[in-house]
């Protein structure tokens, strides 16, 4: 039984305030969760409540969300005497308590902190690891699947300076025999890439972006050339693939219905903006020259026509993030309109674990893949590592093998791999792919 819930304001990896929730039960003591936040957020995401008091934290304070946990959620939830193992009932209670379709009243950051703390308490009450509890809640079959890490090694877009429009360039060690070996391969390529980047762009290029990748690259081709060179020098040509998160909503010009790859330049030449057909052709051209297996958010979040066109004419994994925002209504539309074939699952986009699990199950039912993801404003909380294993998703995106808030998740999966031993398989080499792993 829950005896105490207490929220406080702490800081994320960008130095911005975020919500931490402590939940105490009679039997298993204290359970803690910290909520992440995004930089390039989809407009259809659940609402992250910020104070908007410009005199404090430039308006990014979360004191109202903290107050909502402490004065509204905590007394209401404790009064109900719920069993912490009953995640679905508690999450429904939180959704009903908020009463809005996008969690705008209490705040997605308030609700998610409580939902994840409840999940940890539920696992402890069952005396099982969190990933096993998530698997029970989701009805996931065995064996457990350890995910392929999509490592964001070059940061552009809204995550870094420089002119680079595309937000993330990831290496994908999908041919490794285990998660441990995938981490080694990825870390080796990352270190070589660091050396190559500093050699080409100078010592300052060794500074990293929000997610641990190198930020000082100017064009898409430069980024891809550097990555393929690093893969080659590490000895993994043909074994390590490339994925991109374009985050194209960030540079979509809605009035012109075109895409501006020079969007960081205030004097961008509008004659060089691209139609969605031209942008689709660019992706296909890049995929012919580089080992690209997955593209996330290739088009703007409401440019549905572009997504459908690309889906019909391409043969790699197309991941919806801003398009789908882990929301069942958006996911259903994307399935019906054949817009993409994989979901990027971010728990803070929908704000409860139960709804996140349902989003994954809806995606699996459509034959989609699922990639569990961090946010650019991360914390030391490792819950998504357990979620990706519990959901058997087979893919995780949690930054570069650098910066502790990124590595915390990857290190947790290393521990899970060690704990599970023969009871787990690595998604990249599995003879029984988790779901849509045919592209990699």
UniProtKB/Swiss-Prot annotation:
The gene is eno-1. Mg(2+) is required for catalysis and for stabilizing the dimer. HAMAP family: Enolase. The keyword Magnesium applies. It comes from Tuber borchii. It is found in: Cytoplasm. Its cofactor is Mg(2+). This is Enolase. Its EC number is 4.2.1.11. It comes from the Eukaryota. PANTHER family: ENOLASE. Substrate binds at residues 159, 168, 296, 321, 373-376, 397. NCBIfam families: eno (TIGR01060). Belongs to the enolase family.
